[in-house]
Amino acid sequence: LLDKWKHEEKEFILLIEYVINNQELIIGGSKMKKAGILGGGQLGRMLLQAAANYPVETYILENDSHCPSAHLCHHFTKGDINDYDTVYQFGKNLDVITIEIEAVNVEALEKLESEGVQIIPSPSSLKTIKNKITQKQFYHTNQIPTADFLITQNKKDLQSHTSFFPAVHKLAEGGYDGKGVEVLKDEKDIQRGFDAPAVLEKMIHISKEISIIVAVSKTGEITLYPPAEMVFDPALNLLDYQISPARLEEKVFFKAEAIAVQAVKKLASPGLFAVELLVDHQGEVYVNEIAPRVHNSGHHSIEGNYSSQFDMLWRILLDYPLGSTKPVHTSVLLNIIGAEGHSGQAVYLGLEQVLKTENAFIHLYGKSYTKPGRKMGHITLLGSDISELVFKAHRIKNMLKVVAST
């Protein structure tokens, strides 16, 4: 028995030495996967926080070495996510790559996919979604309900379509966080339109804006998070706060879920998809847009659901079973936005008071500098009474201010 133990001990020591020498973690007989994320903002940061629970080696590609994700990943590469060679060199030795922003070099991802690197979401779905013109054409081709639209190449084109007003003008590429969107009520607003390729959408009289996060495994299994009801800041065109689950009539709820699944199935890609939907006053539901990644409308799931959207994406990337999307509690999420008139080193006024609030969970994004309208963090409130949670959210909004140090 002693000889057997010594033999087994020697084999175990050799195994440990192998792991150390190769700097690889062996889990269940396989190497730790190397996963890359294109982009290093707050979405990447929260993905990395969730990654700590999994056997994965994380890589970030981002042009800003002081980005929110830089100090949380195993390996950081400073570089342009829109440059073909940079993206290709970053990804060629990785097992799987995902994104935290759509504005990436898809051609490099296509090349990497052809060489065996898993790209989630697929380059083909990303190519469809990243341009709002091709995205709207995708909805039309696949008979997915969406607002009527026209395509414009420049501001001059708008003069030929004044009968289409009131409408929403959306830049084909480059828009984010409320930028790249203009409401054109009549021809006097034409000067606010975009002098670049864009979509002109017929205005829908909106009763509610909702979002449904859809998770798709590599085998095609689908699960949905309950719809979240989004309330936007009219001045910033940014998410102000949201309620989950959304307050919807049952028939609207089922209609919204069916449309979200229909749209994501047509993309034919694994991944996590945030389907933003518009509900009109007659209860009709239209797809506004899809984000093929983790999304602001899913942040509440960190505390509000059994498996967060970030946990869910890692399950998909690493071939684990999909998690439970059931809500733990009703939640209200409030974005923390940089105050108007303040640009510079960020200071959080009222933070101590917010921390005293029961069942309030604060997430700061690690951004050193603030500017008007910049997303600096979010707060999730949990409870059972929606009215009380919304009241708390408004109180916190007035209590907490992100200003620049003097």
Regions inferred by a protein language model and the residue ranges of each:
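Short beta-strand-to-turn element immediately C-terminal to the catalytic PLP-Schiff-base lysine
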Residues: 152, 181-186, 214-217, 280, ...
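Peripheral (often C-terminal) accessory segments that flank ATP-dependent C-N-forming ligase machineries
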Residues: 24, 315-406
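Phosphate-binding core of ATP-grasp and ATP-grasp-like enzymes
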Residues: 194-248, 253-287, 291-299, 311, ...
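ATP-binding N-terminal substructure of ATP-dependent carboxylate-amine bond-forming enzymes
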Residues: 22-125, 129-130, 391
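A conserved helix-loop-beta module that forms one wall/lid of the active-site cleft
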Residues: 121-181, 187
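Structural motif corresponding to alpha-helix initiation and N-cap regions
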Residues: 80-84, 106, 155, 187, ...
